[in-house]
Amino acid sequence: MKKLILVFTLVAAVAAGFVSCKKTTHDSDTHTQKYTLGTTSFDINNAITIENIKDSVGQVYNAIMLSQTEQVGYFGSKTKGVVIVFKGDFASGTYNLVFDPEQPLDHFPMYLVAEQEVNNIINFSLSSFLNQADAYAANSGSFTLAMDGNQFTITGTGIEVKKIKDQTQVSTSSVDFEDNMLRFVLSDIVEGDFNGTNLVTAGRTKLEIFSTPYNVAAFITANGDLIGFISETSFDNGIPEGTYSSNDNSIIYVQGMSLKTLKFASSGEATVARDGDTYTIDMTGLAIDGISGTPTMHYVGTMPNFDFPFPEE
């Protein structure tokens, strides 16, 4: 039986990053951008979010850590895609971020880079993170990305780190870790509505797609609010056509992205139709205990083919 997970949030939620680990061979150019850190917020039940990070030309980004356990997150812009990997050592509360602010997300942005310029490396600590964090930018050193099958290795050497705020030198350090990397795609929604609200006129104009080793998913965001999520495990080449029901707890409601509010739909279904890379997805009749009404969603949008191999479970 096809297994679909639908996640709805009717309140503002973090359109968080998701772990990905797939092989591709896209090469990225290197870019130099300096960033300053704005206000921060921290929600122990949801995600750590850095807000209002600005580059030298005033572009605003948000950085999101998915959870305290994943230690991997997504760094993105509402208007321009950014690829990021960051991993934290929660014992020491130190995180290292590497990203390419110019990489467009019109395809899977997993790439192999021989060397990146050092201004794409930012370091910050959890302790300062919780207190209107100071960010630390490296002004020397480099890092490399290497790929072996589905495993990516990131190595940073000779990194001299300075505070962005006052430019005082903090340390000379290295980064050496192996972890998953993100794979993200954004594409415009052709048409759509959620509970009768037009997705386009409401500013909900993005269909975002991610993958993990055993999962591919697509969801719609509204300026940072996650309003719909569909997922099936262990398949490639996109989301299969068909009807997905609430049987076997396959439709889930999560309010505010907090697992404490996770509820299963007692009825309802979603249908997926496909014409090439264009999908029409309708969700109807969702009855969820404690939630008034029956949420519905309809959209037509494009998704790329997931033409890479999945690892064995």
Task: Place the predicted regions along the sequence by residue.
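Bacterial Sec-dependent N-terminal signal peptides
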Residues: 3, 11-46, 181-188, 192-194, ...
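Edge beta-strand at a domain terminus
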Residues: 35, 156-199, 284-313
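A mature extracytoplasmic/lumenal domain signature
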Residues: 48, 88-90, 149, 158-160, ...
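Surface-exposed helix/loop patches within compact recognition domains
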Residues: 52-146, 191, 195-274
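Short beta-strand segments that buttress and anchor functional surface loops
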Residues: 65-71, 156-159, 218-220, 282-288
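Short beta-strand and beta-hairpin "edge-sheet" elements
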Residues: 138, 147, 152-157, 301
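Fold-core signature of tandem repeat domains
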Residues: 143-145, 156, 270-272, 279, ...
